[in-house]
Amino acid sequence: MNTAKTIDYYNKHAQTFVEGTISVDLGSIYAQFVSRLPDSARILDFGCGSGRDTKYFLSQGYMVDAADGSQELCALASQHAGIPVRHMLFQDLNDVQRYDGIWACSSILHLSRADLKVVLEKMIRALRERGIIYTSFKYGTFE
């Protein structure tokens, strides 16, 4: 997949994307994820999009870092969640043992298979001992 094209798409359609995703109810998935976290967990919302999930985790008392590759989505997510959102590509994750949980909801699916392997390794390095990752992908036979 072409990272520049993907980011350009999200920059051009950020408001429409936010409007289409901000109200999606992920309550049952959130519950499964947070049930495996310590009370004072630090979470990375990796590819935070609208900031919907960041806002939820903050409302539950977690420390949250949010990041996205689209500058436009970073701005909208920051407004919605009320925290600064870091503009970065998935490939630029270099944290080591910083997070108890990494939430990558419908985000890293945009990576090529080769980039996905590298990014998953970086995500694992960014986890503290007993840390967990949530990610979601689309069905398909494409890369």
What is each of the regions a protein language model found here?
Residues 1-38, 40-49, 141:
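Conserved class I S-adenosyl-L-methionine
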Residues 50-92:
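Class I SAM-dependent methyltransferase SAM/SAH-binding core
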Residues 91-102:
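A short acidic, Gly/Pro-enriched loop at the edge of an enzyme's catalytic core
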Residues 101-115:
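A short SAM/SAH-binding and catalytic strip from SAM-dependent methyltransferases
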Residues 117-129:
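A short glycine-rich, Lys/Arg-flanked "PGG" loop and its adjoining helix->strand segment in the class I
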Residues 130-137:
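Conserved beta-strand signature within the Rossmann-like core of class I S-adenosyl-L-methionine
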